[in-house]
């Protein structure tokens, strides 16, 4: 349980594991499910302590929701495919107006394709300068924002300058 974020967490061992190393979390306020991997076997919500405490299989006790440590991995968030209409039009992207809290600590990359089984084309990384010039086309576009591993960051609503470019 993580009452601060309206979440209930379930931990379980992956198919090859003998200890809990995977989770399913449910945000009951937003009705959102999340899955992932993290080595935790038990925990207690805030109340007795200021933050939740969870314990790993190796016996290390973690104070959750304090600071930021990405374990050497770059944190990211990625959209699903974005299309105009039902994908019948090509989208020409010309720019981006980012909403990012710590300018310079987050980059954006884009992947485009013209058909669902087509090879994706990569564009970027682009800094989150305000505004950012872009130039690429595709019927489906995915955006990934990747943060610096040594800083705390957040991203709000991103806006793209995109126009329909025909049905070719």
Regions picked out by a protein language model, each given a short descriptive name:
Residues 1-168:
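Beta-sheet repeat architectures centered on beta-propellers
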């Amino acid at each position: 349980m993580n009452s601060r974020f309206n979440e209930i967490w379930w931990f379980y061992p992956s198919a090859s594991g003998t200890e809990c190393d995977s989770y399913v979390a449910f945000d009951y306020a937003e009705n959102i499910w999340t899955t992932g991997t993290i080595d935790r076997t038990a925990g207690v919500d805030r109340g007795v302590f200021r933050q939740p405490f969870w314990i790993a299989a190796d016996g290390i006790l973690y104070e959750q929701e304090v600071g930021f440590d990405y374990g050497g991995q770059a944190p990211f968030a990625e959209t699903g495919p974005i299309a105009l209409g039902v994908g019948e039009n090509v989208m020409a992207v010309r720019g981006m107006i980012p909403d990012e809290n710590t300018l310079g600590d987050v980059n954006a990359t884009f992947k485009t394709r013209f058909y669902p089984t087509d090879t994706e084309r990569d564009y970027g990384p682009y800094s989150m300068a305000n505004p950012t010039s872009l130039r690429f086309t595709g019927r489906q576009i995915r955006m990934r924002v990747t943060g610096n591993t040594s800083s705390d960051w957040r991203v709000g609503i991103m806006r793209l300058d995109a126009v329909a470019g025909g049905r070719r």
